[in-house]
């Protein structure tokens, strides 16, 4: 254990030095989402350059339930960071109007993210963009499995210089580093959440109404998994964009279908569908169909990775 502590201490020292040397007397912004990757990168960068780091939290409209409040409270109030909150929901929805291809979605989201970051950077005079990119992000992007909004989704021409202090780490290593940096468990044990957010948990075109449905379903899945004391790698809901026939009283119903995905993994590179107790799945299905009037059917995805990826898009 002591050996690993020393390894992380050395890693932290090296990364702090690298960030300081790279940024110099300039300012930097960091793309902060509240997930473990960007949070760890933010704390590392904050130690390196202090108030010259400006954390930018963009509300895309594709966030989990309660996410904006959680991020603002944690990083502005508890960590004392310079936090810039940007409400860009209308901008992202407009950019994705009519788009159904998942790769196109990711690239558009990456482009709009960068546009927002460049605007904030210009306002504060920052030259650098720090990102929480980790190894699986660029491995999947290079392998053309899927573009990650912070790698394959980035435009070719950037006005900001990119710094990626975590790019050689895997998720389990980032969690260890976060713990070593003193981040609370509510951060370092958070389930991974895709950079494009709920936009890639809606199959087909993204609309505010569809996002509202999948956000509520996702919250129910997370709540029930936590109540059951289960610790999966990821647990979430996907709106399939397929309506099926059901019965409501004595009347025919034609409603949306939600898929539930719960997997176990160590680093996200491979994953197994979790053998969730039947009563937990039943509770999830009951709550989703009872609390979200638009949903009439809930399915459980039992596919491993490979052949499937963890996220549907």
Swiss-Prot record:
The enzyme's E.C. designation: 6.3.5.2
Keyword field contains ATP-binding: yes
Gene3D superfamilies: 3.30.300.10, HUPs
Domain GMPS ATP-PPase, chain residue ranges per copy: 6-190
One GO cellular component term noted in the UniProt record for this chain: cytosol
Binding locations of ATP: 33-39
Keyword Ligase annotated: yes
Keyword entries, A-Z: ATP-binding, GMP biosynthesis, Ligase, Nucleotide-binding, Purine biosynthesis
GO MF terms, alphabetically ordered: ATP binding; GMP synthase activity
Catalytic activities: XMP + L-glutamine + ATP + H2O = GMP + L-glutamate + AMP + diphosphate + 2 H(+)
PANTHER family, sorted: GMP SYNTHASE [GLUTAMINE-HYDROLYZING] (PTHR11922:SF2), GMP SYNTHASE-RELATED (PTHR11922)
Stored HAMAP family: GMP_synthase_B
Protein name: GMP synthase [glutamine-hydrolyzing] subunit B
Species of origin: Pyrococcus furiosus (strain ATCC 43587 / DSM 3638 / JCM 8422 / Vc1)
């Amino acid at each position: 254990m002591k050996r690993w502590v020393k390894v992380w201490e050395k890693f932290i020292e090296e990364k702090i030095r690298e960030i300081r040397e790279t940024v110099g007397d300039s300012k930097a912004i960091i793309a902060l989402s509240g997930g473990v990757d960007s949070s760890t990168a933010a704390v590392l960068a904050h130690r390196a350059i202090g108030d010259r780091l400006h954390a930018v939290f963009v509300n895309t409209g594709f966030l989990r339930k309660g996410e904006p409040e959680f991020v603002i409270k944690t990083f502005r109030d508890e960590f004392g960071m310079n936090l810039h909150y940007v409400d860009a929901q209308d901008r992202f929805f407009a950019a994705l109007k009519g788009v159904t291809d998942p790769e196109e979605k990711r690239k558009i989201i990456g482009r709009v993210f960068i546009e927002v970051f460049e605007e904030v950077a210009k306002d504060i005079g920052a030259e650098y963009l720090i990102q929480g990119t980790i190894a699986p992000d660029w491995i999947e992007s290079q392998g053309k499995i899927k573009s990650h909004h912070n790698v394959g989704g980035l435009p070719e021409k950037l006005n900001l210089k990119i710094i990626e202090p975590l790019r050689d780490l895997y998720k389990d290593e980032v969690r260890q580093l976060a713990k070593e940096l003193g981040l609370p468990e509510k951060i370092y044990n958070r389930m991974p959440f895709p950079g494009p957010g709920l936009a890639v948990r809606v199959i087909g075109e993204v609309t505010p109404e569809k996002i509202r449905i999948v956000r509520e379903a996702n919250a129910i899945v997370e709540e029930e998994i936590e109540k059951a004391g289960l610790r999966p790698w990821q647990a979430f809901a996907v709106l399939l964009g397929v309506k099926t026939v059901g019965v409501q009283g004595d009347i025919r119903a034609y409603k949306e279908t939600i898929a539930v995905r719960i997997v176990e993994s160590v680093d996200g590179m491979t994953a197994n569908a979790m053998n969730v107790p039947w009563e937990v799945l039943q509770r999830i299905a009951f709550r989703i169909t009872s609390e979200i009037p638009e949903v009439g059917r809930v399915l459980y995805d039992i596919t491993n990775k490979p052949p499937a990826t963890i996220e549907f898009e």
